[in-house]
Amino acid sequence: TIQNENSRDFIGHIGGDDFIIVTEFERSEELAGRIVKAFDEIAPSFYGKEDRARGYIISTDRQSNIQKFPFLSIAIGIVHNMLRPLASFAQVSNIGTELKKAAKKKENSSYIVDRRKD
């Protein structure tokens, strides 16, 4: 866990492997960076020595084909209302989903900040 000094932050579980953190925009990138760094430091410990040496795991995919898979990573989307108004939770959720998908396309753990004004 990341130690968080701001008692006004809210951390919640949306479902599956999705979580939400509500924080001040000014702290969001610093907090996301700390989460990414902490996650990437601990993730290799979930794997055996051989997998860590290789840098990936070998396993079967959903079609029973043997594949190489990267280690776990974390993708964070930062949604805020500093550049445009947000009208509903559904809008926040949709933007968050878009950002998370974009962050997952990167090779390693990452975060993306919504910078759109429309």
Predicted regions and their residues:
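A short glycine-enriched loop-to-beta-strand structural element that forms part of the catalytic core
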Residues: F10-H13, Y47-T97, S110-R116
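Conserved helix-loop-beta segment at the catalytic/binding core of cyclic-nucleotide signaling proteins
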Residues: T1-E30, K37, P44-Y56
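A general structural signal for short secondary-structure junctions and capping/turn motifs
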Residues: E24, I66-P70, A102-A103
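Short, conserved charged micro-motifs
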Residues: R27-A32, L86-S88
